[in-house]
């Protein structure tokens, strides 16, 4: 359905019209001044081009791929100009919702600029056509967070394309850090409790610590050792340095020291929980009030 029609009831913007771009620039400038670099903003979509902001015009203008890419680059550059310090993501539909492949010039253009991938089409169709770009995600997820969104839950229930196992598999294969739902939350939760719990156990990073040993007490001048076996049971890395920290208290319950083990960086630990090694940190408490000395750190 859709496409150009002389008597059509809807209209598409001319996405490189000077007036449109001037107004868009004004908006992005103001939004960037307020939100760029804000630690509470996880990501921002490059969502000002294409139907539903998804970077395609398949049901509207039906632009040729070359023209679609040219226009997409304009909007990508505008967002990057005003959000240089905030994670940006762009829909995979910008290169075609079902276009096969794992390497496209436009997606390389995004990757080189630190812009990551999102896929809003999970479970629009059933079976093998539930999603198309898990291979494309391989170029992004090791360094950048991947975002997924499933089709309207009610629509998939009517069409028969909903499948909880397939949704979980998409999280696994895309190594997704975020998954947004597309329906009334209370309904989707009520009807998919186990699926949502399974997704939450794998989505993004999930630090697990099956073993942690430490002495019951320490005294100044006597070395002590903390041993930890920890790993990442999620499908993606943290994308930032993440270290364990230990708080030591005195006999009155006051904080005597907070120790960060910078030799154990979860950002560098493999995802999927396939490896949960043990590391040991050996330290010595010096005289009261002078802190702690690290004698040695080894794995």
Regions flagged by a language model, labelled:
Residues 236-241, 255-260, 289-291:
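Extended hydrophobic-aromatic, low-complexity segments
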Residues 163-214:
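Catalytic cores of secreted or luminal carbohydrate-active enzymes
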Residues 1-45, 70-82:
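An active-site-proximal structural segment forming one wall of the substrate-binding cleft
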Residues 40, 222-224, 240-242, 273-277, ...:
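Residues at beta-strand starts and edge strands
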């Amino acid at each position: 359905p859709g496409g150009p029609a002389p008597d059509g009831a809807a209209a598409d913007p001319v996405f490189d019209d000077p007036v449109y771009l001037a107004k868009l620039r004004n908006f992005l400038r103001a939004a960037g001044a307020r939100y760029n670099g804000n630690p509470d903003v996880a990501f921002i979509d490059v969502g000002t081009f294409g139907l539903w902001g998804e970077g395609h015009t398949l049901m509207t203008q039906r632009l040729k791929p070359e023209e679609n890419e040219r226009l997409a680059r304009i909007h990508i550059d505008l967002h990057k100009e005003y959000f240089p310090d905030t994670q940006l993501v762009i829909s995979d539909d910008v290169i075609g919702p079902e276009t096969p492949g794992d390497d496209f010039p436009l997606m390389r253009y995004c990757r080189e600029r630190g812009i990551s991938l999102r896929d809003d089409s999970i479970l629009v169709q059933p079976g093998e056509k539930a999603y198309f770009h898990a291979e494309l995600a391989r170029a992004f997820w090791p360094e950048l967070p991947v975002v997924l969104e499933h089709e309207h839950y009610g629509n998939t229930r009517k069409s028969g394309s909903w499948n909880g196992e397939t949704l979980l598999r998409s999280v696994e294969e895309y190594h997704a850090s975020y998954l947004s739902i597309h329906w009334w939350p209370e309904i989707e939760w009520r009807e998919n409790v186990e699926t949502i719990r399974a997704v939450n156990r794998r989505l993004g990073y999930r630090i697990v610590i099956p073993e942690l040993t430490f002495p019951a007490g320490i005294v100044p001048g006597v070395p002590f050792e903390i041993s930890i076996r920890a790993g990442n049971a999620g499908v993606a890395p943290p994308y930032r340095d993440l270290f364990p920290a230990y708080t030591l208290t005195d006999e009155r319950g006051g904080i005597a020291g907070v120790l960060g083990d910078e030799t154990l960086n979860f950002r560098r630990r493999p995802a999927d929980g396939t490896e949960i090694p043990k590391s040991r940190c050996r330290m010595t408490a010096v005289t009261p009030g002078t802190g702690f000395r690290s004698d040695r750190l080894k794995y």
